[in-house]
């Protein structure tokens, strides 16, 4: 059959040259569009390491003025007074939420971009017995607020329990790190517990003397994903002693009980947001944790995650638009090319060829053209990358990436395979539908039409 395929391709070389050139261009463009999307989707679908599917973020806003602006007052007394009032009201909101039947735990968020799966805060930690440091995502949480229970972050065997880590009686001098970070620094997760860690920062005593800030590793937890756009399981959790006072807004993260429908919970609570209020604050929205960066600005700066998601969605929409048009063009070209072969189909039917054999022959010719064009595209793209005109989509993660994304040969093969399958499916559609129509035509009618 291969001999017949090559013979047919050569006999129609004038048309096939244009088909081949079109396929090379389409494969090349598809490669550039699919690569970043495939990488981002891969990272987004990596295990979160905590109960992300049961988390909801509640956004609380100031609806009645709470005192005067703190910047209009000198000294710390007024700020302390307002902070205490703010803390009381946040605890009232937390209690309102805990009274809901669907809610298991509630904790506070100080900054939306500093938490698992949406982290943008990094701190360089010096490595023991080394001159270099590593950049680690940091998360600041409020002690005595059920942080680890709410997120469902699990301690490793031998580490203090979730409740003990959330209480963290040692305050800001204690640190909780993930298993992979502990193994990177100390070689073993279990060996990290109780060790001291130099933060790389110093503090002064007011006389010009500087002292290093030393943390004690209070506990080690299982790996959690710090971000959704790169491989990142290193993470450090640093306790704060109190809520950060904000004059206009606050956020609480809610962990639902097992079996609760999150979509229904969000819809139901959205209709009764005005009922969940303290003296000056009211909860005005509920958003699934995974969607929080897209729907809320951060406390102190524009939400980088929201911008990242916007850019990604824009690139996906652009890629889909171009790929659909390119694929429709390929389908149309092969469709017309196949319909022109009605006479050839009639002759083969007259000589005893079956419908299945004719369709298989046409399809095999398309597969050969697609395979050759993909092979040429791979050579062109390798040179495209080698010359510096383009590059593989490999995020510059602070942590070594063990996945296929950072393995350049494997990365290239996987993306090439995805592109090849998409183009193969497109070509198959452009051949199978018209070929099915022409093989059902009787040989006499097929020859009469020609």
Name the predicted role of every residue range:
Residues 86-88, 142, 201-284:
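Small-residue transmembrane helix packing/gating motifs
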Residues 133-235:
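Hydrophobic secondary-structure segments that place a key small or acidic residue at a functional site
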Residues 2-8, 40-43, 414-450:
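C-terminal membrane-exit region of the final transmembrane helix in multipass inner-membrane proteins
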Residues 3-7, 328-366, 440-450:
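Intracellular coupling helices
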Residues 269-312, 402-404:
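A cross-kingdom feature of multi-pass membrane systems that activates on extracytoplasmic/periplasmic
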Residues 13-38, 307-343, 368-380, 425, ...:
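Hydrophobic alpha-helical transmembrane segments of multi-pass inner-membrane transport and secretion
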Residues 343-389, 418, 422, 426:
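Transmembrane alpha-helical interface segments in multi-pass membrane proteins
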Residues 34-134, 388-402, 408:
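Membrane-proximal extracellular/periplasmic loop immediately following the first transmembrane helix
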